[in-house]
Amino acid sequence: MVKKKKILVVVDAPGPAEFIESVVPLLKEKAEVLLVTVNTSTNAPYNILRKFDPLRADREKDARQIYELFNPDILAIATSSLVLGPYVNNEFTRLAHEHGIKIICFQDFWANHRWPMNWQMMKYWDKVLTPDKLAEKFLLEDGYEKKIEVTGNPNFDRFVKLNKAKERRWLRKKFNLAENDFVILYVGRGTPQSWEYEEITFDFFAKTIRLAQEEIEDKNILVAVRPHPRDENPVRYGKFFKGLRLLDTGSFPSSDDLLPIFDLVAGMQSTNHIEACYLRIPAVCIVLPKAGRLVMEKISLADFPPNLIGASVGIYSHNEESEKETFKKIISDSKCRAEIQKAQKKYFPLPKTSAAKKVAEEILKG
């Protein structure tokens, strides 16, 4: 009997956890798998992967004991999102390099290898699995010379079978929404390293939506706020709520299940904007000079990529009076929404093959 490979999988943030979630069962069919989550106080990756009963390694010193007890043949590790630490992913990567095993990095978002803690580790990665050609392009621009495989993001496989119209009807009925209710999902980005930028952005958003509603008579704008899974103060938005019509979606733990109900997605740059593109939901990425712009500069991105191709709309000016027109146009002008959706269909086609299977194959190859 051929001995099964031992694969150690490590994630430290919700995005990578969602990327690898549908891959884990496929790996377990052919290998011995140890899944490890690295958590801050919100336990975000652990909560997503809880059904697999993952080990926790929430301190850098936990890495060595876990690694040596399991003694893996392959390390599959996500690009880290914990800019402020703990830097457990880096410890696992160093250990794998010391032991001479294959290190496969999987990347869920464009250019996040440019965060300092990931930049230090790139030289150890034998292969990087990227969500698309643009992510590959950024790696090549930054001098990565080893193997790159464009696998797609397994988290987006689910959109192929999703009946958006059916789900939308069911959700709107459940929440007692009227025909003229226009629902905006505000996606939070209040992580420990970005919460100050997040408050600037949401304050701007709330003021702008209030101004837009004053001038739109045929639509009732409702806002559903979904804090980031790693937000350590998710009630921060309450101080900005005055004058907004709110839709309470707290009974749904996952934003993914709610997406079809929304008419617009807004917030600082996030994976939810990409999901909106796949579901043909207009999205607004708010990149203010003293908020989102500063976040993007830290990974050397000039703009959020979907904005550049018209698949989402970028807001760059901290001027509520002028930017209300952007929201008014999207809310009131069906031709504007159709143009956005046309670009989304062109640049974000639904996957034709399973990204989960492709990722599993590439990890098993080593």
Q: What is each PLM-predicted segment?
A:
Residues 53-59, 245-250, 312-322:
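Short acidic-hydrophobic, aromatic-tinged amphipathic segments that line or gate anion-handling sites
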Residues 8-163, 230-232, 254, 272-273:
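Active-site and donor-binding regions of nucleotide-sugar-utilizing enzymes
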